[in-house]
């Protein structure tokens, strides 16, 4: 077609189209709260408005115009072997579905800055009166989830200093929750349940660094329907030193699966010595997904590291490791199918509309459920008696049986939680009761924190558990006994204290994982591998300490660059990475088959 004819057609088309003018958006408004009413201004995100604009269906004129332009002018040919420059398009964002909007649409998470014990006490009392969900706390802050409509009531119960000392941590809880679900398949409760969830590499897998794509399992949070086959696959591939066991049965009848990893003498004539065992658990609170992924990461690293990493091989010859990815399978499954922020188990209580018991408050040592006995709706409900929670009772029975029947000596217990980056040691129920081996607990705790810091530069505080869930104040932080009224939640009846006191596990810790910043329990999937790496490094340091305490410091300081977590199997010695390729390739191929 002659150029003049093309130009005439184009000008004719252009003259018939409506004029559109670009109007700049107003400046972003601040998101503030007032004790006298709802939010003073709704949060306006210009970038979001642009993204929403790009998602609108093009008009008939626009489609006709584009079609004519393409037919008249043609499209530029793409060069062989290289990509054309991508168009400058705004990134589209999928919005949270109606089911999530209905459940969480009016909820936000506020972070309060705490300056003294009086403020702590006032915040605790107000939270109890309004039945608020206290997410977490650290030395000088407390995070609380609540509905926007409740904000005026909360601020009205607080002293003037707290009415202005807060900021929104999560402004759009429904959207943040929606984005936390696995990307592959369906992971949101608005679509299909966890039983039909299939895992596959994320869209960005091909662009990731090589050491970050060795196992697609850790590219996202995995539901129970993927976790269990993955554990079976590990056992089938590494049966020489890995077995799948059950440590109990849940309230809904599910097994509580665990991986036992260790190398035992092959000489049957030789009497087996008492086996030293380390338990690493996660998922006690269902919504703390990062704890499940981290236990799985450590288990995978230990299992695949045997025979290739000198450190791991030595540790597995010295100890058995029992990895329990989720102590609370019922609750964990429920977070994928129904309520992402569910905390307790799914056991029936005296109130049919308030099911669930807090597993970490149901253990027998220093159980004190009086504070929540009359309120099964409380997030910290401990039941009406010790060990009323089925899962806590089952795991305690398994542990006792291991000691009395199977000649097991538990030497360490590590319970992973989130969030706030803290390493906590006994006791949790009271700061007045000091452990007999306090110095050893503090020494190893400091070693774990240092190993993490050397691995990822992340800082984890080391303190007694009784201080870990108490918002510290500007007074004497080393006082022997913090005011009991300042406890943000009950600390009695914890697994940490029970294993330490009743089972005599001398090195018991609760580690609160990432982060301290903006995500709370909704840590993005990009943090799965970094968190796993740093805690894996800490568990290697713990094993070395238990083998020979005096070498811990020099081991951490003397880590060679090749041993830092730059590779996926991050404890490999020089020259050992290549030896892992064949075995890891076979395992990855089997894992790929699992999704089909």
Curated annotation (Swiss-Prot):
The Peptidase M14 domain, residue ranges: 220-546
Binding site residues for substrate: 285-288, 343, 360-361, 418-419
Bias-annotated ranges (Polar residues): 187-207, 583-596
A family per Pfam: Peptidase_M14
Subcellular localization, as worded in the UniProt entry: Vacuole; Secreted
Binding, Zn(2+): 285, 288, 417
Names of required cofactors: Zn(2+)
Gene3D superfamilies reported in the protein's UniProt record: Zn peptidases
Protein name (record): Inactive metallocarboxypeptidase ECM14
Originating species: Arthroderma benhamiae (strain ATCC MYA-4681 / CBS 112371)
Lineage: Eukaryota, Fungi, Dikarya, Ascomycota, Pezizomycotina
């Amino acid at each position: 077609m002659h150029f003049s004819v093309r130009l005439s057609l184009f000008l004719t088309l252009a003259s018939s189209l409506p004029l559109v003018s670009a109007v700049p958006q107003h400046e972003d408004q601040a998101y503030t709260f007032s004790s006298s009413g709802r939010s003073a201004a709704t949060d306006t995100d210009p970038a979001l408005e642009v993204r929403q604009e790009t998602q609108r269906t093009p008009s008939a004129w626009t489609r006709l115009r584009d079609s004519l332009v393409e037919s008249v002018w043609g499209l530029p040919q793409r060069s062989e072997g290289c990509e054309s420059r991508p168009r400058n398009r705004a990134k589209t964002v999928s919005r949270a579905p109606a089911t999530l909007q209905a459940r969480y649409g009016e909820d936000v998470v506020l972070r309060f800055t705490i300056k003294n014990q009086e403020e702590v006490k006032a915040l605790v009392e107000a939270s109890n009166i309004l039945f608020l969900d206290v997410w977490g706390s650290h030395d000088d802050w407390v995070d609380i989830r609540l509905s926007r409509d409740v904000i005026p009531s909360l601020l009205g119960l607080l002293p003037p200093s707290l009415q202005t000392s807060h900021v929104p941590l999560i402004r759009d809880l429904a959207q943040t929750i929606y984005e936390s679900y696995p990307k592959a398949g369906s992971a949101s409760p608005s679509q299909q349940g966890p039983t039909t969830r299939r895992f596959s590499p994320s869209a960005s897998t091909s662009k990731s660094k090589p050491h970050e794509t060795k196992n697609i399992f850790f590219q996202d949070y995995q539901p129970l329907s993927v976790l269990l086959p993955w554990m079976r696959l590990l056992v089938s591939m590494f049966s020489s030193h890995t077995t799948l066991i059950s440590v109990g049965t849940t309230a809904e009848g599910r097994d509580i699966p665990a991986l036992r990893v260790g190398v035992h003498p092959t000489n049957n004539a030789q009497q087996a010595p008492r086996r030293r065992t380390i338990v690493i658990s996660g998922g006690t609170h269902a919504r703390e997904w990062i704890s499940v992924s981290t236990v799985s990461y450590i288990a995978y690293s230990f299992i695949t590291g045997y025979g290739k990493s000198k450190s791991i091989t030595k540790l597995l010859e010295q100890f058995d490791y029992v990895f329990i990815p989720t102590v609370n399978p019922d609750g964990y499954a429920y977070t994928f199918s129904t309520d992402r922020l569910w905390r307790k188990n799914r056991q029936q209580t005296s109130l049919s509309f308030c099911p669930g018991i807090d597993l970490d408050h149901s253990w027998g040592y220093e159980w004190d459920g009086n504070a929540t006995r009359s309120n099964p709706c409380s997030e910290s409900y401990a039941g009406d008696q010790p060990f009323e929670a089925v899962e806590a009772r089952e795991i305690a029975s398994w542990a006792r049986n291991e000691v009395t029947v199977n000649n097991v000596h538990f030497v360490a217990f590590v319970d992973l939680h989130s969030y706030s980056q803290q390493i906590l040691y006994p006791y949790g129920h009271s700061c007045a009761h000091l452990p007999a081996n306090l110095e050893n607990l503090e020494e190893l705790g400091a070693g774990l924190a240092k190993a993490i810091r050397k691995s990822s530069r992340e800082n984890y505080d080391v303190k007694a558990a009784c201080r870990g869930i108490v918002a510290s104040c500007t007074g004497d932080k080393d006082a022997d006994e913090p005011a009991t009224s300042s406890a943000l939640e009950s600390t009695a009846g914890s697994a940490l204290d029970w294993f330490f006191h009743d089972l005599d596990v001398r090195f018991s810790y609760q580690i609160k994982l990432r982060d301290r910043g903006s995500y709370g329990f909704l840590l993005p999937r990009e943090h799965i591998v970094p968190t796993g790496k740093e805690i894996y490094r800490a568990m290697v340091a713990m094993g070395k300490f238990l083998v020979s305490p005096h070498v811990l410091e020099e081991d951490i300081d003397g880590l060679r660059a090749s041993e830092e977590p730059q590779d996926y199997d991050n404890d490999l010695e020089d020259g050992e990475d290549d030896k892992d390729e064949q075995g890891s390739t076979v395992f990855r191929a089997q894992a790929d088959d699992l999704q089909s």
